[in-house]
């Protein structure tokens, strides 16, 4: 019930955002939240790539190892050139927004705010975290947020404690990370956005280019057999063809306005058993003590030999 309610509220927010602020660019990880039980397919692909078709660099940084019941940060970098703009839903130039998804191992969750350090509070200012679902608190989402201010997104994470949860074990785990900047090229419905290239659906000759609704252009193509087919190009992409041009199916009718893209990366983290650390420290201490004893013994022998005139 709570999941259905959260999905309904998410749909309502999306609808209002598109109606009230159509010029805003989007990088909504919760598109995936509403359409997929898990953001990662069996192939390993994060589903955001189904709508954000361009591949871009995403970087992740996590500690090599952490202790049980400790707070650490996972940083996701979504780099792009500052000040870069893209085509908004209404065809105007808008700044890029970013979003990220972090799939933590089972048991790892968003750290409670009362355990955030002052540094974490400063690094996460203006960032709102949500979990993928009530059943998956280990999958965290952020976005959309202004990209120029948040090209690095810091996730405060709480590690689990095997002493209090028998399902958790010490060892090495994988973290799956996805990061996006800018709008997608395809909506979850399968429809194209105005942030993508449009191509000819058939071979033939450009018969006409007429204005359509809301600033769109309707390109009519007359095929060799006399039939006609049209392609509606929304406001935003630049039409590259002219009336009378001969084209083949798949020929680009517009430029590609997209400047954003999605990337994913995996990272590894070790949930370290503190007993092993204590044992390792004890071993190092024993080795150091043995070295000291050997040095002292050697000096003692040298003194005895010197006294005996050897």
Curated annotation (Swiss-Prot):
Its main location: membrane. Keywords: Electron transport, Heme, Iron, Membrane, Metal-binding, Photosynthesis, Signal, Thylakoid, Transmembrane, Transmembrane helix, Transport. The keyword Endoplasmic reticulum does not apply. The keyword Iron applies. Binds 1 heme group covalently. Residues 1-27 form the signal peptide. Coiled coil: none annotated. It comes from Synechococcus sp. (strain CC9605). The lineage of its organism: Bacteria, Bacillati, Cyanobacteriota, Cyanophyceae, Synechococcales. This is Cytochrome f. NCBIfam families: PRK02693.1. It is a single-pass membrane protein.
